């Protein structure tokens, strides 16, 4: 099991961040339940990666963002990964996800950071404001994976979190510094 990765789940108010986590982890979200504003919760999850390794995730369920309110900066400094959530029936929520991605890039200084994007509430397709193709094109241009999901179908939630855990548990790339006792490649030592 890995060291435990910190994942920040963020998006506008009422896009379903808490519902996604509750359904994914406990399978107990009730559709039509009245929204309660989240201050901040931390969920612990053990997620199996695509390599069969279990990765411990600390999922930070953030307070829903509102107009003019930014994600507190401390999240950018400690997060190993992000889940950006928008609602397919709320264009403003998608636009906020676009801004959040830019903020992550700025604060992480373009360092490799695991990000997945979830377009929630696909069961409300008759109220759709975010075109699926436009969202996928944006995700492709930003080099992030995007899934459209619904808390009414728990299976739609599993793959994004499996991929995220897999990205977070990838072995560190090899050091570019020579290790003691090893010869450098391309450095022939003819004096021996």
Swiss-Prot record:
Record's keyword terms, sorted: Cytoplasm, GTP-binding, Nucleotide-binding
Disordered as annotated region, ranges: 168-192
GO biological process, one term: lung alveolus development
Function: Atypical Ras-like protein that acts as a potent regulator of NF-kappa-B activity by preventing the degradation of NF-kappa-B inhibitor beta (NFKBIB) by most signals, explaining why NFKBIB is more resistant to degradation. May act by blocking phosphorylation of NFKBIB and mediating cytoplasmic retention of p65/RELA NF-kappa-B subunit. It is unclear whether it acts as a GTPase. Both GTP- and GDP-bound forms block phosphorylation of NFKBIB.
Domain note: In contrast to other members of the Ras family, the members of the KappaB-Ras subfamily do not contain the conserved Gly and Gln residues in positions 13 and 65, which are replaced by Leu residues, and are therefore similar to the constitutively active forms of oncogenic forms of Ras. This suggests that members of this family are clearly different from other small GTPases proteins.
Subunit (UniProt): Interacts with both NF-kappa-B inhibitor alpha (NFKBIA) and beta (NFKBIB) in vitro. However, it probably only interacts with NFKBIB in vivo. Forms a complex with NFKBIB and NF-kappa-B heterodimer (p50/NFKB1 and p65/RELA). Also interacts with c-Rel (REL).
Cellular localization per UniProt: Cytoplasm
Family to which this protein belongs: Belongs to the small GTPase superfamily. Ras family. KappaB-Ras subfamily.
Gene3D superfamilies: P-loop containing nucleotide triphosphate hydrolases
Claim: GTP-binding is one of the keywords in the record: yes
Protein name (database record): NF-kappa-B inhibitor-interacting Ras-like protein 1
Binding site for GTP: 11-18, 61-65, 120-123
Record-level GO cellular component terms: cytosol; endoplasmic reticulum
SUPFAM superfamilies: P-loop containing nucleoside triphosphate hydrolases
Region (Interactions with NFKBIA and NFKBIB): 58-93
Organism superkingdom: Eukaryota
Xref: Pfam families: Ras
Organism field: Homo sapiens (Human)
InterPro entries attached to this UniProt entry: KBRS, P-loop_NTPase, Small_GTP-bd, Small_GTPase
């Amino acid at each position: 099991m890995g060291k435990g990765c910190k994942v920040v789940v963020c998006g506008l108010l009422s896009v379903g961040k808490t519902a996604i986590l509750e359904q994914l982890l406990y399978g107990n979200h009730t559709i039509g339940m009245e929204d309660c504003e989240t201050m901040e919760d931390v969920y612990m999850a053990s997620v199996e990666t695509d390599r069969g390794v279990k990765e411990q995730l600390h999922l930070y369920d953030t307070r829903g963002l509102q107009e003019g309110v930014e994600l507190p900066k401390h999240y950018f400094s400690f997060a190993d990964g992000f889940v950006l959530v928008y609602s397919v029936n709320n264009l403003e929520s998608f636009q906020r996800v676009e801004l959040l991605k830019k903020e992550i890039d700025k604060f992480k200084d373009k360092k490799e950071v695991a990000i997945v994007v979830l377009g929630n509430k696909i069961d409300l397709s008759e109220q759709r404001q975010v075109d699926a193709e436009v969202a996928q094109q944006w995700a492709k241009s930003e080099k992030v994976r995007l899934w459209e999901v619904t808390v009414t179908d728990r299976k739609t939630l599993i793959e994004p979190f499996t991929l995220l855990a897999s990205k977070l548990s990838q072995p560190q790339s090899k050091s570019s510094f020579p290790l003691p006792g090893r010869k450098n490649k391309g450095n022939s030592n003819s004096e021996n």
